[in-house]
A protein has these predicted regions:
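Non-catalytic accessory regions flanking glycosidase/transglycosidase catalytic cores in CAZymes
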Residues: 1-42, 82, 122, 129-133
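Active-site region of glycoside hydrolase catalytic domains
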Residues: 93-167
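Aromatic-lined substrate-binding rim segments of carbohydrate-active enzymes
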Residues: 22-92, 162-167
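Glutamate identity and glutamate-enriched acidic tracts
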Residues: 6, 18, 25, 30, ...
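Aromatic- and acidic-residue-enriched carbohydrate-binding clefts of CAZyme catalytic domains
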Residues: 1-19, 58-65, 93-114
Length: 167
């Protein structure tokens, strides 16, 4: 499977959800944050999906990941690390980490639909509200690796996304 949608279709919602939960519990631990700080790094980048606060559509059986982000923020503060949160996926996909099923004709079209823009901005607003005052927050990346060559309707972007980000 090339992405979360295809993986869920292959495994089924129950198995997919259990594997995702196991991944969240074991992939990154407090010990990783301790070791990162111990070797002298001062920051971590945490990719978050558009559904970090829980499922927002029926297409994919998502479990909320926000508790794991909360935990990572706490660990970062404990080990004096800065955190860059990165919106890593959006409905419709934005490029290499496309959430949509992959086909030779598939394109990143999150910005072409009002819903895609709304979901992206709503998720960013919720992240800012939740972590904006966190001592460890370095920033929030608006979108991870958007592919320039597939942008459509670029001038219909929702207010709030700076024009320089679209260059």
């Amino acid at each position: 499977a090339a992405n979360a949608v295809e993986l869920q279709r292959a495994l089924g919602p129950a198995v997919y959800s259990e594997r995702l939960r196991h991944h969240f519990e074991t992939f990154i631990t407090e010990d990783d944050f301790r070791r990162i700080a111990a070797i002298g790094f001062n920051s971590v980048r945490i990719p978050v999906p558009w559904h970090v606060f829980g499922a927002q559509e029926d297409a994919i059986a998502n479990i909320p990941a926000i508790d794991y982000v909360d935990r990572a923020i706490e660990w970062a503060e404990k080990y004096k690390l800065s955190v860059l949160l990165s919106l890593a996926t959006v409905p419709g996909g934005q490029g290499d980490s496309n959430e949509s099923p992959t086909t030779p004709e598939s394109t990143a079209d999150w910005h072409s639909s009002k819903n895609g823009r709304h979901v992206a901005l709503t998720t960013l607003e919720k992240l800012a509200a939740r972590y904006g005052s966190a001592a460890s927050l370095l920033g929030i990346e608006l979108l991870d690796s958007p592919v320039v060559s597939v942008r459509k309707n670029i001038f219909t972007m929702t207010d709030g996304i700076p024009a320089h980000y679209l260059r």
